[in-house]
């Protein structure tokens, strides 16, 4: 699920936001996805 967060400059925001509502975060290109 893409939540509209960029992975640049840091993946930490992506992972942190994904953990709130999902399980984990990963990057595809510069876009954060939660799964």
Curated annotation (Swiss-Prot):
The keyword GTP-binding is assigned to this record: no
Annotated S-S bridges: 7-27, 14-32, 18-34
Molecular function, one GO term: toxin activity
Organism: Buthus sp. (strain IY-2001)
Protein name per the record: Neurotoxin
Keyword Disulfide bond tagged: yes
Keyword list, A-Z: Disulfide bond, Neurotoxin, Secreted, Toxin
Tissues where the protein occurs: Expressed by the venom gland.
Entry GO CC: extracellular region
Cellular localisation: Secreted
General function of this protein: Neurotoxin. Decreases the action potential of myelinated nerves in mice and frogs.
């Amino acid at each position: 699920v893409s939540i509209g967060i960029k992975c640049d400059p840091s993946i930490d925001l992506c992972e942190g936001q994904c953990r709130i509502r999902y399980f984990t975060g990963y990057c595809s290109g510069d876009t954060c996805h939660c799964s």
